[in-house]
């Protein structure tokens, strides 16, 4: 019965997202909340300048409303769901402030790196202090085995790294129409299956609400995008998926299921290190999706390829996390 409820959860979130987006997009246009495009980016992206951004608000509202309704209905509104909503709201708020400064204050870089990091740290610390011993414990498990390693307070550092790193990695992936919406839906879908296998139905409800919300948003975010989620959406999704992995004790498996996000981040790190040490670039441009664009791939081809890779990694992650 609850498994059917998960499909209903995704369906409800999808419908709310699809219903809200056509109302919210004109509102963003009226406020002139348009995306600015970097001059150093691919030339084909210049035509996207002015496309409404901060659409992540639609994802958040759709996900939050659906999660609360379904979690209450199935009596699963516990510490885990509360923590997930806290992290999603906190990182979404940081993203909102970042977007707001960009589009209203006309400061292209938004929040400073220091301001953003402080905000991310505060949310991550709150997550750890509230959840430790209640929603999760301080050990990690080797995926596909019963082997566990107690980390003690070193787990605190891991939580900070995962939440901050996860939010930034997902944020880097949001560079092409529909890219993040699709890969996020796939990753959260994979974790929902693992959550069901662990009988963590509150986490599963949250994951399926996210799946429905981002797929509904994808209807308007697919190429050519009518709206972007902005940092409001990408930082929230990144923090949320890291929190889900922590609550499911699948910290290491996040590297596989979130492999697309990891690859995007590594491409930036490699590019920076290479340029600073040798003066040469490994990629034509980073993050990785822009490299393939500059190699002559169409935007849609890059997106579908990354979705496909994300799907294969998700299947591998489910196999390791459930059947091994």
From Swiss-Prot:
This is Phospho-N-acetylmuramoyl-pentapeptide-transferase. GO terms for biological process: cell division; cell wall organization; peptidoglycan biosynthetic process; regulation of cell shape. It catalyses: UDP-N-acetyl-alpha-D-muramoyl-L-alanyl-gamma-D-glutamyl-meso-2,6-diaminopimeloyl-D-alanyl-D-alanine + di-trans,octa-cis-undecaprenyl phosphate = di-trans,octa-cis-undecaprenyl diphospho-N-acetyl-alpha-D-muramoyl-L-alanyl-D-glutamyl-meso-2,6-diaminopimeloyl-D-alanyl-D-alanine + UMP. The chain crosses the membrane at residues 5-25, 52-72, 77-97, 122-142, 149-169, 176-196, 201-221, 227-247, 253-273, 302-322. Disulfide bonds: none annotated. The keyword Magnesium applies. Its EC number is 2.7.8.13. Its main location: membrane. It comes from the Bacteria. It is a multi-pass membrane protein. It holds the Pfam family MraY_sig1. Pathway: Cell wall biogenesis; peptidoglycan biosynthesis. Keywords: Cell cycle, Cell division, Cell membrane, Cell shape, Cell wall biogenesis/degradation, Magnesium, Membrane, Metal-binding, Peptidoglycan synthesis, Transferase, Transmembrane, Transmembrane helix. InterPro entries: Glycosyl_transferase_4, PNAcMuramoyl-5peptid_Trfase, PNAcMuramoyl-5peptid_Trfase_CS. The gene is mraY. Belongs to the glycosyltransferase 4 family. MraY subfamily. It comes from Bacillus mycoides (strain KBAB4). Its cofactor is Mg(2+).
